[in-house]
């Protein structure tokens, strides 16, 4: 503990607080430091240690562990989870053995699947598993440089913001670009007219996806032209692109079907093959015909197709993941002393509604909100009550059944001396 010198109050050399304003003041050779500054330094060192530990330790996760972690949150996409687990493991190896970075190329991923099948959730889950910064962008808002819209460099800015402007961490992050199918060029053949939101964006993304030193404006692209740029190397960033690619199944069917005429022709029904079976025959040429340029596809060596969710998959999504929707609502009711019960038939009815609306898993929450809205409004008055949801309530928009909770009988234990 520092003492007064010549009856003058001593102060911290860092925060300038005097010894009367802090609990302890420790003297050094030529200065003083207070207990508050020491705690702050310890906190900063610990945060830095955790950051470095996260970057170095995630490489030890084998593909099987990554696969299991994805399946704990994402339902019905086992094949896609396996493909992504291997791709991320390769990234981890590149980080652990830097000398292999030039020898082993990174595995950027293209996710193809219908809306609401879990593309975005898989990318978010991956970032959490390996504890790296994550940023998401919408391809529809991107335009070629010099036109009204968002520059591709702004995607990297979002990742930098997610990493608290720690460039080292940002350079090892994951970027997910959604709606990538919306930047397909308008025709299969190159056009004379400029396609600034289609092929132009694909061309702009080529360099940052392959790996380059990008100049990122810390305050956003065009509103602050005089700002200093931050240099970020995108070589080790993992890019995951996702899209529904509506209509690509027709391109695949046109390629795979052998058209014959006459009495020996095989007549196929449109329902002979479902969406998932058709996507299993996907080839790079099909994506080129859809509108992705070959150079852009070359930067996405790993292609994973996600299955269309059926009724059972949607029921599983409601109940099985760690953060399942039913578990979330049951916890909210529990906090107010109420009990929420879903009958099995009610869960099936919710899944059927989502299938009818063709919104996939994304539509489940909206349906639950509609079913539980009035009950949630009165939740604070439902202490010690049971709220039961049946199939009839879901189908006909009826009010939930509310009745007193069953009291558990307490069993008295005989105490022997």
Curated annotation (Swiss-Prot):
What the entry lists under Pfam families is as follows: AAA_2 (PF07724), ClpB_D2-small (PF10431), zf-C4_ClpX (PF06689)
Q: Which PROSITE patterns match?
A: CLPX_ZB
This protein's record includes keyword Metal-binding? yes
Annotated residues for binding of Zn(2+)? 12, 15, 34, 37
Task: Kindly state one GO CC term assigned in the UniProt record.
Answer: HslUV protease complex
Q: Which UniProt keywords apply?
A: ATP-binding, Chaperone, Metal-binding, Nucleotide-binding, Zinc
Q: What does the entry list as the binding residues for ATP?
A: 114-121
Domain of life, per lineage:
Bacteria
- UniProt KW Isomerase keyword: no
One GO BP on record is: cell division
**Gene Ontology MF terms in the entry:** ATP binding; ATP hydrolysis activity; ATP-dependent protein folding chaperone; protein dimerization activity; unfolded protein binding; zinc ion binding
ClpX-type ZB domain: residues covered: 1-53
Q: Note the InterPro entries from the entry.
A: AAA+_ATPase, ATP-dep_Clp_protease_ClpX, ATPase_AAA_core, Clp_ATPase_C, Clp_protease_ATP-bd_su_ClpX, ClpX_bact, P-loop_NTPase, Znf_CppX_C4
What family classification does the UniProt entry report for this protein? Belongs to the ClpX chaperone family.
| Function according to Swiss-Prot or TrEMBL | ATP-dependent specificity component of the Clp protease. It directs the protease to specific substrates. Can perform chaperone functions in the absence of ClpP.
The subunit structure is:
Component of the ClpX-ClpP complex. Forms a hexameric ring that, in the presence of ATP, binds to fourteen ClpP subunits assembled into a disk-like structure with a central cavity, resembling the structure of eukaryotic proteasomes.
Task: Kindly provide the name given to this protein in its UniProt entry.
Answer: ATP-dependent Clp protease ATP-binding subunit ClpX
Species of origin reads Orientia tsutsugamushi (strain Boryong)
